[in-house]
Amino acid sequence: MGHFSSMFNGLARTFSIKRVKNNNGNSDAKEAADDMAKDAKKKELILKSSGYVNAQGSNNSASIFSKRGEKGVNQDCALVWEGFGCQEDMIFCGIFDGHGPWGHYVSKHVRNSMPSSLLCNWQNILAQATLDLEGSNKKLSRFDIWKQSYLKTCATVDQELEHHRKIDAYYSGSTSLTIVRQGDVIYVANVGDSRAVLATVSDEESLVAVQLTLDFKPNLPQEEERILGCQGRVFCLEDEPGVHRVWQPDAKTPGLAMSRAFGDYCIKDYGLVSVPEVTQRHISTKDHFIILASDGIWDVISNQEAVEIVSSTAERPKAAKRLVEQAVRAWKKKRRGISMDDMSVVCLFLHSSSSSSLSQHATTFK
């Protein structure tokens, strides 16, 4: 109990500046979270473009790279926030993959809204849980707090997007794959078909890939059951065998190749949801790094290949870019005649360079 109380008290001091002025509850917490984001951006702790983040004294570092495919504007985007919520032991990472005519606007809106909203909800739920447990012997679960925070955040972001005056998300949407590292635990929240893969040392002392997320495709049994139960349809087109898509009951639209996403309100009544799957994992010294990538990478690169590409990159800042470059080569070789997808990668390194075989140089890709 003492650990969580001190955690809350430290965060509460940061939020209290806004609450001294008035007592508007959630609106104040949201404003404070937005101010934290602005301050972090000034201190170069938030990265939204291709580059590298490594705060002084932090065990975390992250490499980002995004490349436009051959289908038009790049609808992928990413974000890393080191020192998330002014907490030295926290980092937030995310990959957001848009689709549809307004997909690039949707993905950027989700990217920009989610971190502050998540921080606000985490603060409020943590505060309430701390108050509820005062004087009791119940064990406070950090996972339950993060899960509730993510569920509330995703519902809020999707609702805001539906009523956005400048973004038409009726036939457009975005996936979202995010990770929060807090000390020696990571919390993963997945909406869609981007994927997180962990590189860890096996009992045989080799570096192996462990997939941390499910690709939420419409033909997964639990996903298809929900869609069919809501009168939606799931089938492949004749010229795309093996590519299962979600369709409205009486029309050949929209043909969405994932079962969870923000936006896409044309089929929200027919089984598509924006509910995240939230999981946790305790980090050990055997865990080296985590790769977050949009589906364009995984269409042509296996989990193990991705781990080997990143681990063999001498400089951490170049890791994400090198993985994308290898995927571009694989697209040209394996998927000739098919327009290359947008591809984005975040490589989150879990230990300082002094305890890793990968060298580290702070640099930014232009």
Kindly label every feature range from the protein language model.
Residues 2-366:
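PP2C/PPM-type serine/threonine phosphatase catalytic core
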